[in-house]
Regions:
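Conserved N-proximal alpha/beta basic substrate-recognition cap immediately N-terminal to
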Residues: 6-8, 15-114, 119
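A short beta-strand motif that forms the metal-chelation/ATP-contact edge
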Residues: 55-60, 188-191, 268-279
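ATP-grasp fold ATP-binding core
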Residues: 105-106, 128-148, 170-183, 200, ...
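Rossmann-like NAD(P)H-binding beta-loop-alpha module
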Residues: 109-136
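Phosphate-binding site of ATP-dependent enzymes
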Residues: 152-247, 263
């Protein structure tokens, strides 16, 4: 007979028609949570029938339509989140949801891909000229590379895409295209409870001129061991994130999950993104990584139980 589960965990997701085949982690994560005597449930964040109070932990997994309705998502998060039960913490998610967090990490000494945030078409054109000859245009709030393109700096599409983004009520981010991404891709280092779990190499996604390599959004993922300088920058970025969490949000507990995306340049590695909200972990490329994640969730449940017992005493 099975013992009582350590706890019930909601893996926060969205509808299948949004996810498609892009969610590659959740099956293995669910299996390892069950193996750790945890009861997982996939829960769509905008499903009004879900009883969020029935869960011990709410773990953000893949609510990938949030960027189309960010205000609605944040209002939902604020309504259901209870202290210690929503992971990663809502304050961190709110900060990380907008990619302008990169500028704060830069100010803390983390080398980032040069980034300009634009609020008008004129600012976009000036930033494109400065960042060229080849640039990446994206919204500051986005998921799955939506409304993101690699373009020549003088391509008329730069302005038309920027106007669409601005019309959606978002700011525009302009970055130079990093040549090594087209050949070597990016390095993504995944941390669970602040400890490096594994790293993968992500192949190029964007095609010059707009659109995706191969005509559709796909990620070519392979296991990798980063060079020392890349690994050191990932750790530096994590240290800066911990500093932000402590100073701004009084959060001193390690984040349950984080993914640090890095690129290599002639001037050394640079931070491209720090994914603290809804990243893929690519557990299929790293045997044992889903089990490590499940162990971290089990520790959170145990800590939550201790806090509850102390409160009730």
């Amino acid at each position: 007979m099975n013992s009582k589960p350590l706890g019930r965990v909601a893996l926060i997701t969205t509808s299948d028609d949004v996810l498609g085949y892009d969610e590659v982690d959740i099956d293995e994560i669910e299996a390892e949570l069950r193996a750790a005597n945890i009861a997982p449930t996939r829960a769509v964040w905008h499903d009004p029938s879900v009883d969020w109070d029935a869960f011990d932990l709410l773990v953000v997994r893949c609510p990938w339509d949030y960027s189309e309705r960010p205000r609605e998502f944040l209002a939902w998060m604020d309504a259901v989140a209870a202290p210690g039960r929503f992971l990663n913490p809502p304050d961190v998610i709110r900060w990380n949801l907008d990619k302008t967090y990169l500028l704060e990490l830069r100010d803390l000494g983390v080398p980032i891909v040069p980034t300009r945030v634009c609020h008008t078409p004129a600012e976009v054109l000036a930033a494109a000229r400065a960042a060229g000859p080849t640039i990446v245009v994206k919204p500051t709030v986005s998921a799955g590379s939506k409304d993101t393109a690699m373009l020549d700096g003088d391509d008329p599409v730069v302005l038309s895409l920027a106007e669409k983004i601005l019309g959606d009520g978002k700011a525009v981010m302009i970055q130079p295209a990093i040549p090594s991404v087209a050949t070597a891709g990016e390095t993504a280092s995944i941390y669970f409870d602040g400890v490096l779990s594994h790293s993968v190499r992500k192949g190029p996604i964007l095609e010059l001129g707009g659109g995706f390599v191969g005509g559709a959004y796909t990620e070519a993922i392979s296991a990798t061991t980063p060079p020392p300088a890349v690994a050191a920058l990932a750790d530096q970025a994590m240290a800066a994130i911990r500093a932000v969490c402590a100073a701004r949000f009084a959060i001193r507990e390690p984040l349950l999950y984080a993914r640090i995306d890095l690129v290599e340049t002639p001037a050394g590695p640079k931070l491209l993104e720090a994914e603290l909200f809804e990243p893929s972990y690519f557990v299929g490329q790293a045997p044992g990584s889903a089990a490590r994640f499940a162990s971290c969730v089990a520790r959170r449940l145990a800590t939550l139980g201790e806090r509850t017992s102390s409160t009730n005493f």
